[in-house]
């Protein structure tokens, strides 16, 4: 059995197939109100007592006399077994009465019951009844439809009871498209004022009348203004007044009128379609019929030759439908189209009705399509298909990736103070802090000038430069030790609460200027953004946009940083960046606070992060405590909470760090993240071996292994990172990553100030890559050309 959504969009390629049941937008009727106030089922007369009382519903249907010899109320004909047990308001019985009314109108408008449009409406009504019917009623649904056809023929031929069916139609469109003229053509008499030179309708008014026994009420509205600088405000005011007017009594059908001869590929009413969608919601298009006026105008091509009428109409309708799809952000909708001509000189048939160039009499078709829309809308109200279908892009269903959140959570290490890096270096230097510096024990060296250096042999030059490099390393190590002693002494003085510990006010100094152009262009405004570092611990800088326009400011955001040591044990820092352009607005901020206790250097840390992701914001809270369990061992426990897209993700982790001597650092952690009914587990192990001259020379090699488990899948990742100096003036960085899914990458970065041959190797590699790419593109073009030639031949 098809679901409701399949029922709505199953037949979307024809004129009637676009009639899904109305949406749940407040613009449309409330189903309870519709049942109480606007139900179209005729009032049931007093039932005729039969000679023998029925025993059941099925036996009652079998012993009924011919329809021409009785007057049986519709409610009794379509009652189900549930109604016989006491329910008076059965929606299936009311739909049965609605079917009879629809079939009577089919005959009245001269349509055959075998008409494709009639068949599709009946099919949808039948399918809707099957969806809502209970198991005991399924057998009677088909029987009701057959009885409805027979009863409709009988009632329409006899005219008893009188048809009680009404239409309430809202008319929308620009000024001058023929809204009032179309209303007059439907009634066959002037009921609404028209004027060819000025707007004929300046206020909302209802025009009522009867067409073929159907009570029709048109809600005529003021025309929308053409596109201009002030039209949007005026059109919005008109639409808001219309929305207030139809709020109490919503229309059954919406007509959107436009001139067929004024539509081209440069359709200028897209902003109007967007405005209608914004005011009423996308659901208004679910029961909207596109009415094209001036449909009998002469059709000519670009060269003045006549074109096929059907293709002429189809092209223009495709344009309008395309922009409606863009306005509602949905391509499933296909609105039905009605072609209308109101000019007195239009061709007429013997009955005096307007005939279009394709031979169609548009007035009966107009009424019949409005009836189909009304019937499907009433079925939706009676069966209470609410929130079953919607137009536009679905609501954001983006969910965060638990493995990604867990990976970020495990890597994130909370700050424990402003001098966190300095503390780690001090621990390494304290081991040999009291020893005499090796630099002071070195013999003096004579620095050679350029002329003397050139006279040395190649081996002597190498020995001389190596000696200078060695002395430079020892000198830098001596400076680090002196800095470490200074910080240690300041800490001792601070702990003794001496007055000399007050920090001196730092003088404001200008920061280095941002990179400017090579030329001295006076129009370049970089001088307006010079940054100053003052003693207030706030740093404000613009964010540079590398893709900016020439002679433009080139900055599209602002960056703010601050860090403060509130007291001896409390440290706080905050970083924020805001960027905005015409397409998006991005924000990133990080806030950290750390409190340190002297007991085993225990540190409590808290971090709050905010980051934009598309149209959503990601909030992240993380807290943890770090405790030095042994002299060279530190344990860290942390918890985290992340909010994204209205969902929350909670995680926890345990991390342990061990220092082995001066050069080996081992780190292991494990954690878990939960959210949205899912769980991700992971952990990592890292071993870092530092160089002999660390931290003066940042030479080290690191081995990492991470494991993530999610939905019974395990992903292992192996990594190798190394930085070393194979020779003086040459640095090499290697980064290798691989996983158990046979995926990975290798990055090698080489930097040298002496070996210029490396630049030639890089240039040759890039040249070969460009040549290979051009050959690939030429091969693809040749293959495409061969395929085209083969198809043509």
From Swiss-Prot:
GO terms for cellular component: chloroplast outer membrane. Residues 199-203 are annotated as: G2. Keywords: Chloroplast, Coiled coil, Cytoplasm, GTP-binding, Hydrolase, Magnesium, Membrane, Metal-binding, Nucleotide-binding, Plastid, Plastid outer membrane, Protein transport, Receptor, Transmembrane, Transmembrane helix, Transport. GO terms for molecular function: GTP binding; hydrolase activity; metal ion binding. GO terms for biological process: protein targeting to chloroplast; protein transport. SUPFAM superfamilies: P-loop containing nucleoside triphosphate hydrolases (SSF52540). GTP binds at residues 176-181, 195-200, 294, 341-342. Its EC number is 3.6.5.-. It is a single-pass membrane protein. Residues 130-157, 410-442, 477-503 form a coiled coil. Pfam families: AIG1, TOC159_MAD. GTPase involved in protein precursor import into chloroplasts. Seems to recognize chloroplast-destined precursor proteins and regulate their presentation to the translocation channel through GTP hydrolysis. Probably specialized in the import of nuclear encoded photosynthetic preproteins from the cytoplasm to the chloroplast. This is Translocase of chloroplast 90, chloroplastic. It comes from Arabidopsis thaliana.
């Amino acid at each position: 059995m098809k679901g409701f959504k399949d029922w709505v969009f199953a037949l979307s390629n024809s004129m009637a197939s676009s009639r899904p049941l109305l949406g749940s937008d407040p613009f449309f009727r409330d189903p309870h109100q519709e049942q109480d106030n606007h139900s179209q089922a005729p009032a049931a007369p007093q039932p005729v007592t039969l000679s023998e009382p029925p025993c059941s519903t099925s036996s009652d249907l079998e012993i009924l006399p011919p329809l021409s010899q009785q007057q049986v109320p519709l409610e009794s004909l379509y009652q189900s077994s549930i109604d016989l047990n006491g329910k008076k308001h059965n929606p299936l019985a009311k739909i049965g009465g609605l079917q009879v009314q629809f079939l009577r109108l089919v005959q009245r408008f001269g349509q055959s019951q075998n008409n494709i449009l009639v068949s599709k409406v009946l099919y949808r009504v039948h399918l809707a009844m099957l969806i809502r019917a209970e198991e005991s009623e399924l057998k009677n649904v088909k029987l009701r439809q057959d009885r409805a056809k027979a009863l409709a023929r009988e009632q329409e031929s006899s005219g008893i009871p009188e048809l009680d069916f009404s239409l309430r139609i809202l008319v929308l469109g620009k000024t001058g498209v023929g809204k009032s003229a179309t209303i007059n053509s439907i009634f066959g008499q002037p009921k609404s004022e028209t004027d060819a030179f000025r707007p004929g309708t300046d206020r909302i008014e209802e025009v009522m009348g009867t067409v073929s026994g159907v009570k029709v009420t048109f809600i005529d509205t003021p025309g929308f203004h053409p596109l201009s600088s002030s039209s949007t405000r005026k059109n919005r005011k008109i639409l808001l007044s219309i929305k207030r007017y139809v709020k109490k009594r919503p229309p059954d059908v919406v007509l959107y009128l436009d001139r067929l001869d004024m539509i081209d590929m440069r359709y200028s009413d897209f902003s109007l379609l967007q405005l209608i969608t914004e005011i009423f919601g996308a659901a208004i298009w679910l029961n909207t019929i596109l009415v094209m006026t001036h449909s009998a105008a002469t059709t000519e091509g670009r060269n003045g030759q006549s074109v096929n009428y059907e293709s002429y109409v189809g092209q223009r309708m495709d344009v309008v439908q395309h922009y409606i799809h863009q306005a509602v952000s949905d391509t499933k909708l296909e609105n039905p189209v009605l072609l209308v001509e109101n000019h007195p000189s239009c061709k007429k048939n013997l009955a005096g009705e307007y005939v279009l160039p394709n031979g169609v009499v548009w007035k009966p078709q107009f009424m019949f399509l409005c009836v189909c829309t009304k019937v499907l809308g009433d079925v939706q109200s009676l069966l209470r298909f609410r929130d079953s279908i919607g137009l536009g892009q679905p609501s954001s269903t983006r969910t965060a990736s638990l493995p990604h959140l867990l990976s970020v959570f495990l890597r994130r290490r909370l700050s424990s103070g402003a001098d966190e890096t300095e503390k780690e270096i001090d621990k390494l230097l304290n081991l040999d802090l009291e020893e005499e510096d090796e630099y002071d024990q070195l013999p003096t060296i004579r620095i050679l000038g350029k002329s003397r250096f050139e006279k040395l042999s190649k081996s002597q030059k190498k020995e001389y430069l190596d000696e200078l490099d060695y002395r430079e390393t020892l000198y830098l190590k001596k400076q680090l030790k002196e800095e470490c002693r200074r910080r240690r002494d300041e800490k001792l003085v601070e702990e003794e609460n001496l007055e000399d510990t007050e920090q001196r006010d730092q003088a404001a100094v200008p920061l280095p200027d941002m990179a400017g152009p090579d030329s001295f262009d006076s129009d370049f405004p970089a001088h307006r953004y010079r940054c100053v570092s003052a003693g207030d611990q706030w740093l404000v800088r613009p964010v540079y946009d590398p893709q900016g326009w020439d002679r433009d400011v080139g900055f599209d955001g602002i960056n703010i940083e601050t860090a403060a040591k509130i007291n001896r044990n409390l440290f706080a820092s905050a970083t924020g960046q805001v960027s905005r352009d015409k397409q998006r607005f991005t924000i990133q901020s990080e806030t950290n606070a750390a409190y340190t206790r002297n007991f085993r250097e225990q540190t409590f840390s808290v971090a709050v992060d905010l980051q934009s992701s598309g149209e959503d914001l990601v909030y992240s809270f993380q807290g943890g405590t770090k405790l030095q369990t042994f002299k060279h061992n530190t344990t860290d426990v942390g918890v985290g909470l992340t909010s994204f897209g209205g969902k929350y993700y909670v995680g926890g982790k345990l991390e342990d760090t061990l220092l082995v001597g001066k050069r080996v650092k081992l780190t292991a952690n494990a954690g878990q993240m939960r959210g949205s009914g899912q769980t991700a587990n992971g952990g990592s192990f890292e071993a870092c071996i530092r160089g002999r001259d660390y931290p003066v020379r940042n030479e080290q090699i690191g081995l990492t292994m991470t494991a993530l488990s999610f939905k019974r899948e395990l992903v292992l990742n192996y990594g190798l990172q190394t930085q070393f100096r194979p020779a003086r003036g040459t640095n090499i960085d290697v980064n290798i990553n691989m996983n158990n899914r046979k995926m990975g990458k290798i990055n090698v970065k080489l930097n040298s100030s002496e070996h210029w041959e490396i630049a030639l190797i890089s240039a040759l590699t890039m040249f070969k890559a460009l040549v290979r790419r051009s050959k690939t593109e030429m091969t693809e073009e040749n293959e495409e050309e061969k395929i085209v030639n083969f198809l043509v031949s």
